[in-house]
Amino acid sequence: MPTPKKGPRLASSPAHERLMLANMATSLFQNGRITTTLPKAKRLRPLAERLITFAKRGDLHSRRRVMRVIRNKSVVHILFTQIAEQMEQREGGYTRIVKIAPRVGDAAPAAVIELVTEPVAKKAVVKEAEAAAKVAEEEAPAVEAEATEATEAPVEEAAAVEAEAPADAEKAE
């Protein structure tokens, strides 16, 4: 028998827990959001995010690894085509857990787990602009130093000429 994870299990056996999480992940990818208890949602989140990361890779090995968990081929197809395309710009945080009112029958803490579909803020563009500005700053002092050297040479010559000029003026007096 496989050793269970630390802490209480969601079901009576590890196999039942794996099947329950696989079924919830399938429902999540089919519908975009599901309502469940808070502990189940917290256990589902890492699994769902890992499966979406595999889907973003998009290769055959990743598809086979996802098929180990999600047995429904149509859901895997949706995951690899639609959901992975939506999450392409996002680097994690693909799901959101929102607590809702306790369940009516037994007052169990309920939650909604859903896929995050809002577009990602344009932080990548800002980072690229900052990187370009940093490169421009590094190049600017080099160009400025060359320009300074070019302008300093005449100043030194002028100082030498000025030093000679007072000496000539003293001789003239």
Curated annotation (Swiss-Prot):
InterPro entries: Ribosomal_bL17, Ribosomal_bL17_CS, Ribosomal_bL17_sf. Residues 138-149 have a biased composition (Acidic residues). GO terms for cellular component: cytosolic large ribosomal subunit. Gene3D superfamilies: Ribosomal protein L17. The keyword Ribosomal protein applies. Pfam families: Ribosomal_L17 (PF01196). Residues 150-166 have a biased composition (Low complexity). GO terms for biological process: translation. Keywords: Ribonucleoprotein, Ribosomal protein. Residues 136-173 are annotated as: Disordered. One of its GO terms (molecular function) is structural constituent of ribosome. The keyword Transferase does not apply. HAMAP family: Ribosomal_bL17 (MF_01368). Part of the 50S ribosomal subunit. Contacts protein L32. Belongs to the bacterial ribosomal protein bL17 family. NCBIfam families: L17. This is Large ribosomal subunit protein bL17. It comes from Bifidobacterium longum subsp. infantis (strain ATCC 15697 / DSM 20088 / JCM 1222 / NCTC 11817 / S12).
